[in-house]
């Protein structure tokens, strides 16, 4: 026994699955000011934490509408971007347009949100309103838009993606909006004030 040094020391090693985190931020006009800046601050904190952890891939996207079209852009992808991209470019992000919500989710799922076997997958959403978008061809609002969002959320879950969706409130928020948000995201819906996000 005295010749075995393992008697005196033990090392506990824990292994964690690789993880993929997608952060999607609503950059519609109503998010301007504190809501957007706090959402960005929160996202940056998660990106930095993931970078230190070393085994978490992070993608951050922003969504809004422009020229009568839904827009979603990937502003950071840890697989190929350095953290300096955030400090150099994110300061130019501004809010505008309306909330296309799951119209953008559908596009994201095709390229960014497919589940990866053996890895943990998470989707975090920041938003402050109900889905709304219209042009000459489509009117995306109310119950049909909510049902479409429900469908996309269910599809993500079926792909093994865990969801947390945050409704950002500031002052008075219509009860109907909160009800719609809960209808779309169910138990994954959370309500937060931007002053308490960090």
Give the location of each predicted region.
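Acidic, glycine-rich A-domain
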Residues: 1-198
């Amino acid at each position: 026994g005295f010749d075995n040094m393992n008697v005196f020391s033990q090392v506990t090693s824990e292994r964690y699955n690789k993880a993929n985190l997608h952060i999607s931020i609503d950059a519609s006009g109503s998010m301007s000011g504190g809501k957007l800046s706090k959402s960005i601050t929160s996202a940056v904190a998660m990106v930095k934490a993931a970078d230190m952890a070393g085994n978490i891939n992070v993608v951050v996207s922003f969504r809004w509408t422009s020229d009568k079209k839904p827009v979603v852009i990937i502003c950071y992808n840890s697989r190929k971007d350095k953290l300096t991209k955030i400090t150099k470019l994110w300061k130019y992000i501004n809010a505008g347009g309306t909330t296309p919500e799951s119209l953008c989710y559908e596009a994201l799922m095709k390229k960014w949100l497919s589940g990866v076997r053996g890895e943990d997958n998470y989707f975090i959403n920041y938003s402050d309103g109900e889905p709304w978008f219209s042009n000459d061809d489509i009117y995306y609002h109310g119950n049909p838009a909510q049902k479409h969002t429900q469908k996309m959320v269910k599809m993500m879950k079926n792909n093994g993606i865990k969801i947390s969706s945050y409704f950002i409130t500031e002052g008075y928020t219509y009860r109907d909006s909160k009800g719609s948000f809960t209808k779309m995201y169910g138990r994954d819906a959370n309500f937060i004030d931007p002053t308490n996000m960090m």
